């Protein structure tokens, strides 16, 4: 047993040393890096940067609000349990003195910035636990023109709604893997294309957990594969206010989930959908304690009648982007000389 633990420790150490060696920029609060704050590291990247810049962030509690204003950046934490970015910001409070949402989150991605990756980090907006208000508070916020965003092996948490708000309605493409998401109403709420797999969700509200806006393209979709959903007793799965399309494949729901299908929520003034309310598809999804009829298999009702094996990154993003290939290339840089 001791040999196994020692081998595991050595493998972790080797992986850490390789990431450290391959990083373009190192952030360390103890002064043993290029910068002691993440924002200073981000600011050091050239505006003309066209290749991925790997910023390695050593363990620490980073009480920072981040503004990402350059493309092609990879933020890699030493360990998601101990590399923590935390800041308290309430959206409505921010908007009292600011014209838009840029700056309302912990991580703020400027319009038209592309190709950003977050790996092995905790990102948390803790306004609610500090001040008792669980209204909208972003952990990550992005808007127009922001696309090709990867979140891998991360905890993304907010003490309010809209935890992960990637809102490029035109053609946003987002991929999240092996993550934990937590929040209140609509806490994972992409616009455009989004693919999440091998991840866990925890919701604290009785309104909705996931949300989607696919109103500008009939092919926009929110796909969740091999995910686990949990929350407070009676938590609902999801809703949408505009045209949307959900695919849930091989997902598991805790017994706390309410008997309430993903629903079209009313707006004022009322919205008329272009493609109908029924574009919510399931395959092999089950609830602990017993299934509800509304999440039975119905993939054959989707346009093109896709089979489960067909639902991969290339299919989801229409062959425009394969984030799993990108992620593997990034990780290969960490282990090239292992």
Sequence positions of predicted segments:
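Bacterial Sec-dependent N-terminal signal peptides
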Residues: 1-24
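Sequence-level preference for short, compositionally simple segments enriched
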Residues: 24-32, 36-338
């Amino acid at each position: 047993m001791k040999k196994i633990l020692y081998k595991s420790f050595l493998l972790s150490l080797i992986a850490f040393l390789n990431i450290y060696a391959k990083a373009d920029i190192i952030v360390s609060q103890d002064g043993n890096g290029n910068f002691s704050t993440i924002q200073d590291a981000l600011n050091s990247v050239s505006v003309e940067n066209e290749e991925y810049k790997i910023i390695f962030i050593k363990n620490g509690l980073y009480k920072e609000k981040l503004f990402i204003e350059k493309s092609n950046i990879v933020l890699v934490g030493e360990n998601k349990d101990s590399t923590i970015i935390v800041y308290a910001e309430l959206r409505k409070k921010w908007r009292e003195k600011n014209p838009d949402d840029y700056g309302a989150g912990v991580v703020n991605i400027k319009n038209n910035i592309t190709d950003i990756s977050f790996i092995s980090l905790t990102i948390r907006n803790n306004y609610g636990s500090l001040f008792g208000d669980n209204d909208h508070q972003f952990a990550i916020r992005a808007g127009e023109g922001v696309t090709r965003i990867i979140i891998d092996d991360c905890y993304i948490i907010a003490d309010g709604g809209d935890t992960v708000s990637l809102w490029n309605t035109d053609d946003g493409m987002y991929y999240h893997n092996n993550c934990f998401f937590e929040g209140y109403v609509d806490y994972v709420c992409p616009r455009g294309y989004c693919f999440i797999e091998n991840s866990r969700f925890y919701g604290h509200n009785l309104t909705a957990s996931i949300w989607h806006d696919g109103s500008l393209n009939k092919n926009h979709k929110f796909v969740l594969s091999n995910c686990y959903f949990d929350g407070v007793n009676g938590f609902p799965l999801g809703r949408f206010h505009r045209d949307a399309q959900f695919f849930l494949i091989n997902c598991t729901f805790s017994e706390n989930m309410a008997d309430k299908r993903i629903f079209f929520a009313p707006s004022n003034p009322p919205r008329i959908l272009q493609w109908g309310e029924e574009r919510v598809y399931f395959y092999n999804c089950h609830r602990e304690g017993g299934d509800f009829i509304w999440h039975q298999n119905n993939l054959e009702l989707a346009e093109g009648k896709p089979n489960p094996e067909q639902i991969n990154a290339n299919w989801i993003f229409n062959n425009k982007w394969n984030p799993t290939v990108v992620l593997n290339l990034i990780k290969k840089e960490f282990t090239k000389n292992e």
